[in-house]
Amino acid sequence: MGELNKTKCVSCSEGLPPLAERESEELLKEIPEWVIVSEDGVSRLVRTFTFENFREAMAFAGSVGELAESEQHHPKLVTEWGKVRVEWWTHAVHGLHMNDFVMAARTDELFQEL
């Protein structure tokens, strides 16, 4: 996982450019379970985590929520029976920022700790 999971998010503001595609593809190598998808022209990191039941899925979603609050960087979470889909992107840059890769790595770490 490299060092991404040990990195803290940094504040970013409107008007900053998103990461270049080449940079994103390089960083993606550190979080190989994630994919980059585009929705409405905005790139996002996406991964679906699977669980034995709804209770485990909800507990994981809650843990991701706590992580998001601690970093003030919030994902889209979709929780269903036995799975949680997590999407990270940065609204301020209308795409991917280093923070999204950091949070994806830290989300992976939460999952591994279960």
From Swiss-Prot:
It is an enzyme of class 4 (lyase). InterPro entries: PCD_sf (IPR036428), Pterin-4-alpha-carb_dehyd (IPR050376), Pterin_deHydtase (IPR001533). It comes from the Bacteria. CDD domains: PCD_DCoH_subfamily_a. Belongs to the pterin-4-alpha-carbinolamine dehydratase family. It comes from Chlorobium luteolum (strain DSM 273 / BCRC 81028 / 2530). HAMAP family: Pterin_4_alpha. Disulfide bonds: none annotated. One of its GO terms (biological process) is tetrahydrobiopterin biosynthetic process. PANTHER family: PTERIN-4-ALPHA-CARBINOLAMINE DEHYDRATASE-RELATED (PTHR42805:SF1). Its EC number is 4.2.1.96. It catalyses: (4aS,6R)-4a-hydroxy-L-erythro-5,6,7,8-tetrahydrobiopterin = (6R)-L-erythro-6,7-dihydrobiopterin + H2O. It holds the Pfam family Pterin_4a. Keywords: Lyase. This is Putative pterin-4-alpha-carbinolamine dehydratase. One of its GO terms (molecular function) is 4-alpha-hydroxytetrahydrobiopterin dehydratase activity.
